[in-house]
Curated annotation (Swiss-Prot):
One annotated GO biological process: division septum assembly
Cofactor dependency: Mg(2+)
MF (Gene Ontology): GTP binding; metal ion binding
Gene that this polypeptide is encoded by: engB
Keywords: Cell cycle, Cell division, GTP-binding, Magnesium, Metal-binding, Nucleotide-binding, Septation
Record family assignment: Belongs to the TRAFAC class TrmE-Era-EngA-EngB-Septin-like GTPase superfamily. EngB GTPase family.
One Pfam short name: MMR_HSR1
Entries under NCBIfam families matching the protein: GTPase_YsxC
Protein known as: Probable GTP-binding protein EngB
Residues noted as binding Mg(2+) in the record, renumbered to the chain: 38, 59
InterPro entries from the UniProt entry: G_ENGB_dom, GTP-bd, GTP-bd_ribosome_bio_YsxC, P-loop_NTPase
Length: 208
């Protein structure tokens, strides 16, 4: 079983010069405003670290968290950073994904060699939105051989059973599902442990 032994806030950055040194592998969490990034991060890490903005789309800083993961079964202990990006696409503050990510954020994603995994959160109730398609295309266009992209569907518990089943069968792979705090709705949907195992596997495939 994987346990998060430590998780704490490092810094908020609005410029590359403000970012912490690239000393360990990192995963980036990205998604539209109100997709549930803060809830996902807090559940994943077992600690209330990520804060939701009172005004969706207002935050423009990247938040860095240091985390230590332990897999006792495999005698493994590893430290990774989690980078929480500002939510994109809120209609009142942005006209396009390109504008959202120009400058600092795009430069951060393009040049930071320590980033090994992009986790794109998608609202399960609103699939195939143009802004999510654009986000996926932009991330995949800059992926290096030592990086991976993974979709994770939030708000899964808001779907009825037929909708859940269709999503599970038809969603493009690879993907994970974040149901209500990762409580398994049935044996075929992932628990928090499965999510952690999957992310750890990606992060360890190409360590820094």
């Amino acid at each position: 079983m994987i346990a998060i032994k430590d998780a704490h806030f490092l810094t908020s950055s609005g410029q590359l010069s403000q970012c912490p040194a690239s000393l360990t592998s990192e995963m980036v969490i990205l998604g539209r405003s109100n997709v549930g990034k803060s809830s996902f991060i807090n559940t994943l890490l077992g600690k209330n670290l990520a804060k939701s903005s009172a005004t969706p789309g207002k935050t423009r800083l990247a938040n860095f968290f240091s985390t230590t993961w332990e897999d006792k079964e495999n005698a493994l202990r590893a430290t990774f950073n989690v980078i929480d990006l500002p939510g994109f696409g809120y209609a009142k503050v942005s006209k396009s994904l390109k504008k959202e990510w120009e400058g600092f954020l795009w430069e951060l994603l393009s040049v930071r060699v320590s980033i090994k995994l992009f986790i794109h959160l998608v609202d399960a109730r609103h699939l195939n939105l143009e802004i999510d398609k654009n986000a996926k295309e932009n991330i995949q266009a800059l992926l290096r051989p030592d990086q991976a992209y993974l979709s994770l569907f939030t708000k899964f518990d808001k779907l009825n059973k037929n909708e859940q089943h269709r999503l599970f069968l038809n969603a493009p792979k690879p993907f994970l599902i974040n149901s209500a705090h990762f409580n398994a709705l049935s044996s075929k949907y992932p628990t928090l442990e499965v999510v952690r195992q999957t992310l750890l596997k990606y992060l360890l495939t190409n360590p820094l």
